[in-house]
Regions:
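HIT superfamily nucleotide-processing domains
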Residues: 1-147
């Protein structure tokens, strides 16, 4: 099933279709829009979204995915040239457990500086038991055979 062009009530669809002018659009193209979120984590924190409604990254078709990655690179390079951050995060959450709150695909491009208040994005404690990592790798390798 192809993604819908627009979902009624989706705030990001309204931005993508140009109906919500309350956000600061930084750049855009035929397939995507880049803008500041309402509550940026750091100066320059930017969201890149597809114009077509897609719930998350794992539901995007490969051509649109390629367009979005090209957009992220373009936006990230612009942020890098303009703000000279010490680093950058690219974040995409899929599903409530991963803290997705807007169910329209969005990629966070977050410039980072020492002591920026953003904090660590990975757990500090080693809570993962990697005893069966070979089995997990085999399962993923098998599924990678399907596009």
């Amino acid at each position: 099933m192809a993604p819908e062009t627009e979902v009624e009530g989706c705030a990001f669809c309204a931005i993508a279709q140009g109906r919500d002018r309350s956000v600061e659009v930084l750049c855009e193209d035929r397939d995507w829009v880049a803008f500041f979120p309402l509550k940026p984590a750091t100066p320059g924190h930017t969201l890149v979204i597809p114009r077509r409604h897609v719930a998350d990254l794992w539901k995007v078709d490969p051509p649109l995915g390629a367009e979005l990655m090209a957009a992220v690179i373009r936006v990230g390079r612009a942020i890098d040239r303009a703000l000279k951050p010490e680093g950058m995060n690219l974040i995409s959450s899929a599903g409530e457990i991963a803290e997705q709150t807007m169910f329209h695909l969005h990629l966070h491009v977050v410039p980072r500086w020492h002591r920026d208040g953003f904090g660590k994005i990975w757990p500090i404690d080693d809570k993962f038991d990697d005893a069966n990592l070979d089995d997990v790798a085999d399962l993923i390798r098998e599924e990678c055979q399907t596009p």
